[in-house]
Each structure stands twice: as structure tokens, then as C-alpha cells.
Amino acid sequence: YYTCLNNVLESKPRIVIDDGCDLIFLAHKEYPDVVKSMYGACEETTTGIVRLRAMHKDKALKFPVVAVNNAYSKYLFDNRYGTGQSVIEGILSATNTLIAGKNVVVIGYGWCGRGIAQRLKGLGAKVHVVETSNSAPDGPSGYHRALEALYDGCWVGTLDEIADKGDVFISATGNKHVINEKHMNKMKDGAILANAGHFNNEIDLNGLESISASSKEILPNVDKYELKNGKHIILLSKGRLVNLSQPTGQGHPIEIMDASFATPVSYTHLTLPTKVEV
């Protein structure tokens, strides 16, 4: 992955279309000459926007970036319908578990989280929503999203309250260690953990290792952790994105991705100087 990122930057691009801010971050860290010659970039994901805001706050961002993720044509469709469908498909493909009647905990009720919750309800799950954010710079706060989840018919509370009752836990926050060692120790025997956020740190994997006596892969993208307390937990895709990890994760439907990729392409002209012909 990083070999590919470096290869891209060594080609001295003038504009980049990023997914997660990895390319932009690496450029600022190791390719200052490339950064100086760049017109700008586009960022596709919620997690990437979070990283970019942190860079901007620290005055570390050296060129303009269009927040494609904030476009209606992106998050209303890709985040909600694409993620909602592909995450459920990834979980079912890996586990063949029955969703109907299950207590499924969705952590994060942004557009991805609400899309996941909507499809879970359609499959007959009892959906529980945990919102971890207190405020948001350009949208409703976590309190408002939690209230929205309640009005959408979901149970709403903290992960501490529901940790011992959930059958399946799906993180969709873009934040670090939202499911931690304390939560996992409380979970029921056979609980399933899946990450639908971005990087593989939404679930505290080191914490899971520390409370486990042993672990083994029992199916592709399905690891069984035998906990020291006598229970076991199922981790999908080794904590990586459950909807993208092959062979069980197939990603979003192509109809969704057509629109998602068309959006940053159409925005690239905003990063070009006026003297450049498109």
C-alpha cells in the first residue's frame, strides 16, 4: 500500500484525489518539494476530513483541499446506501449469521451509521445506537444524532450500558478505540465485532489481545478470540474495513461508486489556477 503511495508521489502530481488523507499526509511528511508544486487535492472520506481539519488547525496544510465527502452527491448516497448495504453483506458473507432478532449495536450515527442501522432494521434486528461525538464542526452534534436515532426507532445509550447485551457490534465513527478492552471484557459469549469506519484502530486490537488466552482464524476474515474470562469473541477482517476486506467484503455496488468517483473528478477544477485549461 505504502509502496503505491510513494510511487504516486514520486511521479510529482499536481492534483491528488485522496481516500483517508494518507496520500496528502505522506506528501506533507516526506515530499515537501511535491507539496510546493501542487495545486490542491480532493478528499473522499469522513476520516480523511477529520485528519485534514487537524492539519489545518495546526497550520500544517500547505495547499487547498476540497472536502468531497461533504458533498450531497457523496454522503447522501455512498455513505448511507453504499456503506449500509456493503457492510451488512460483508458480515453475512463472513459469518452466515442470522440478523433477525439479534441485538446489533451501531456505534456512530453519521450517514454511514444510519445507513447500516436502516438496513439492519429491515432485516429484523433490534438496533441499538451509541453516539460517541459531543460536537461537530459543520453538522449536528452527537447529541442531535443520538436523538435522531431515537426518533428513528433505535435504542440509544452508551456502550457501557449495552456491551453485555449486544450480539453484533459495528463501529462507524472514524475515531480510535471506540470499542476498548473494558467493553470487550463485558461482552457476551460469541459476540461479533466489525469495523465499518476507516482504519483498523476503531477496535482496540492490542486490548483484545491482552484479555485473550488464544486466538485463531476459523474462516477467511473470521478470527476467534478465547478470552481469559472463559468467553470468546469473533473479530471480522482483523479489525479492518469489513466491507472491503477480500474475500468476504466486496465493497460498494458499482452504481454507487460511479457517482462517488464522478464527484471528486468534477471538483478538481476548483483546485486549478485560472490560467490552466481543463
Where in this protein do the model-derived segments appear?
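Glycine/serine-rich phosphate-binding loop and adjoining beta1-alpha1 elements at the start
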Residues: 1-102
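Conserved small/polar residues in nucleotide/adenosyl-binding loops
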Residues: 267-274
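Conserved active-site and cofactor/substrate-binding residues in soluble primary-metabolism enzymes
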Residues: 3, 11, 18, 43-50, ...
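Rossmann-like NAD(P)-binding element
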Residues: 157-202
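Glycine-rich phosphate/diphosphate-binding loop of Rossmann-like nucleotide-binding domains
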Residues: 85, 93-162, 171
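Rossmann-fold NAD(P)-binding glycine/threonine-rich loop
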Residues: 48-58, 197-232
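Long, C-terminal catalytic modules of enzymes
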Residues: 240-263
